[in-house]
Amino acid sequence: MPVWRGESLLGKTITVQAEQGFGDIIQYARFLPFLKVMGAKSVVLLQHGSLHNLFGQMDCIDTFTNMPEEGIATESDYWIGIISLPYYISLAPAYARSLFPCNLKKIVGSEGYLDAIPSNIPKKLAVNWSTSKGLLHYVRTMHPEKMLEVVGDNAYSFNPEEDRFWSPLPNDGWKKDWNKTASHLKACKGLVTVDTGIAHLAGALGVKTVVIMPKKEFKCWRWKHGTWYDSVVTVEEDELHKIPDLIRRM
């Protein structure tokens, strides 16, 4: 199956390979409607199953699958990695390119591009101090005691591994379903988190969020160039004193 390199998609089926971590996938999902604007007959999204219900609200996606080696994901006319979409948007005709700005002045969907029905949990702050156990886990993760000093204990833990000092979320399967996570997050006052997937979910939902950055040498490019999420404010590790006031303004 050939990689899509900008050929006509009229009457064609294309498989989009979700890449990198959950945050990256949520961040780049805003560009998926572009493929339908370019005439794709069918868009197949190959991704982790925990994201299926969340992205089910996007009518531009015709089929979801988590089977990379057989079935519908292997039967398309083309395939493309989701992170490559902005590049091909930059090469698209003006009528399509203008619908999906991606530059320092404006990034499409920065105001929020996903919906969620708030759950019925009492309104509190949401917190997450830990990232997935990848290469940058110890760079981005914050000591929970330090997070407690900054935000207090009147909050829900959105860390799927442990709750520590904060209230647990209902045991409803949210740890394996990003759509349920979105519903709980939408019910919260706001979110304080380190740089991890929940930050992107909050931004995509338009939830007011403070993202605590790692040391400057490890700060991810996405927080340096353009505004991906209007509802997200970043703070450096020497600016933690600003967080209580940012919480009060949520």
Kindly label every feature range from the protein language model.
Residues 83, 91, 203-250:
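Nucleotide-sugar donor-binding patch of glycosyltransferase catalytic domains
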Residues 49-54, 61, 65-124, 130-131:
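A nucleotide-sugar donor-handling region in carbohydrate enzymes
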Residues 1-9, 148-210:
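Donor-binding and catalytic core of enzymes assembling or modifying cell-surface/extracellular glycoconjugates
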Residues 23-31, 37-38, 114-120, 125-127, ...:
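Conserved catalytic-core segment of nucleotide-activated headgroup transferases in glycan assembly
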Residues 9-54:
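N-terminal pre-catalytic "stem/leader" segment of glycosyltransferase-like enzymes
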Residues 1-12, 108-117:
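Non-catalytic membrane-proximal stalk/linker segments that position and tether the catalytic domains
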Residues 47-52, 67-70, 158-165, 196, ...:
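Short, polar loop motifs at secondary-structure junctions
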Residues 63-68, 173, 232-239:
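Short acidic-hydrophobic, aromatic-tinged amphipathic segments that line or gate anion-handling sites
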